């Protein structure tokens, strides 16, 4: 089926789709661009957009109206009138209170480390599909990848900023200058985040080391950058040695849908030189450092034993134009399928979209979330069959 070809419509009716304004701290992304809304309205679906939802990407209310959307004064109006809610970040408590059993929620969720959110979604009865666990034919995570690329690149920008002495850092320039050594950048995890962090760091002239436990990943990184990167198989002793010597450590580990492993211990942080910088890109899934806790764009860093910690949970929200369009490029085919076919038929037809289903009908169907939070794992097929067409 072509990328924008209309799917068969089991529902026999077109869908009412809601686009609320994001309310997380300094979150300027939006779930649907005007171009994406245009694709939906051309198919006969109705889209209700909260006023100023797109202002962060330069999309005015008028731009949405021009492609067939209607504008609502507030979020309750959007939730009340919609069947499917399309967002970027996980719903905050005031948004979760507006979810109903007949809602489909399509957004990032990151439930494994978030017991409160999971409990509220279970209580709502809504069909909750997480971008970050949707898969593809290659075993990848296509809706997580765009933001992982952005976050990986931003991690080095953040590190360069907070290495500066006025910002609490040691006063080193990532690339050094002739006659002065560059900063040592240690990247834990060689996946999408890690590779894009490495690309930025190498481009700035940093001394880059990648640790991973997948030899194929290490081979790929070495083939890609050659002498520009050092690759090391990640063991506890190797990690201790590299972290102690690092000026910057990037936490780029990922376990699909699960909490991130705490690979950097308190003792490792204590071993680092004053003014070193930790950037925890895994903070959405609980963080890769024992000393991590989530921060915001308003107050992005804190110090532990004179080591700068940057752990902003929505890093790509600071570059909303780039990240919103990159995200929509990936999510639009799935959004169209859900709207055209209805959630039940779309989930039954597409195993990759089905892997994104985390909570439905008051039950948890994502194994990593059930394991992390102690929920009984419900049968996926039975819960999907119970969704209204």
Regions flagged by a language model, labelled:
Residues 3-9, 16, 22, 93-184, ...:
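Glycine/serine-rich phosphate-binding loop and adjoining beta1-alpha1 elements at the start
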Residues 4-5, 12-14, 19-120, 124:
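An N-terminal-biased, well-structured beta-alpha scaffold segment characteristic
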Residues 19, 48-51, 71-73, 79, ...:
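General beta-strand structural signal in soluble alpha/beta enzymes
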Residues 20-59, 166-251, 301:
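Glycine-rich phosphate/diphosphate-binding loop of Rossmann-like nucleotide-binding domains
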Residues 83, 89-90, 109-110, 235, ...:
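Short glycine-/small-residue-rich Rossmann-like dinucleotide-binding loops
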Residues 132-173, 283, 288-389:
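Adenosine-phosphate binding glycine-rich loop
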Residues 223-305:
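Rossmann-like adenosine-cofactor binding region
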């Amino acid at each position: 089926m072509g990328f924008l070809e209309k799917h068969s419509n089991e529902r026999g009716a077109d869908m009412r789709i809601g686009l609320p304004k994001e309310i997380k701290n300094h979150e300027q992304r939006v779930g649907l661009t005007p171009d994406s809304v245009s694709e939906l309205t051309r198919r006969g679906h109705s889209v209700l957009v909260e006023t100023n939802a797109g202002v962060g990407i330069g999309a005015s209310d008028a731009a949405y109206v021009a492609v067939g959307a209607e504008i609502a004064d507030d979020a309750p109006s959007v939730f009340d009138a919609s069947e499917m809610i399309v967002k970027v970040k996980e719903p905050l408590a005031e948004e979760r209170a507006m979810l109903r059993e007949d809602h489909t929620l399509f957004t990032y969720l990151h439930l494994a480390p978030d017991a409160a959110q999971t409990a509220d979604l279970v209580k709502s009865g809504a069909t909750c599909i997480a971008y970050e666990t949707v898969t593809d034919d290659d075993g990848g995570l296509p809706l997580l990848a765009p933001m992982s690329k952005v976050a990986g690149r931003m991690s080095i920008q953040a590190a360069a900023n907070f290495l500066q002495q006025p910002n609490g850092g040691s006063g080193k320039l990532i690339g050094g200058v002739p006659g002065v050594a560059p900063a040592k950048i240690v990247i834990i995890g060689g996946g999408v985040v890690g590779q894009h962090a490495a690309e930025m760091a190498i481009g700035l002239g940093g001394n880059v080391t990648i640790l991973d436990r997948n030899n194929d990943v290490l081979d790929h990184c070495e083939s890609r950058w050659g002498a520009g990167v050092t690759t090391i198989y990640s063991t506890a002793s190797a990690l201790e040695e590299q972290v102690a010597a690092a000026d910057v450590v990037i936490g780029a580990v990922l376990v699909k849908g699960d909490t991130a492993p705490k690979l950097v211990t308190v003792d490792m942080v204590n071993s680092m030189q004053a003014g070193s910088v930790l950037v925890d890109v895994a903070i959405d899934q609980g963080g890769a450092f024992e000393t991590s806790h989530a921060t915001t764009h308003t107050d992005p860093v804190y110090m532990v034993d004179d080591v700068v910690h940057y752990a902003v949970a929505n890093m790509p929200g600071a570059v909303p134009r780039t990240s919103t369009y990159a995200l929509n490029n990936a999510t639009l085919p799935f959004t169209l399928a859900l709207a055209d076919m209805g959630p039940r038929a779309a989930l039954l037809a597409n195993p990759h979209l089905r892997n994104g289903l985390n909570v439905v009908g008051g039950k948890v169907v994502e194994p990593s979330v059930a394991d992390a939070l102690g929920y009984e794992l419900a049968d996926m097929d039975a819960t999907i069959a119970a969704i209204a067409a």
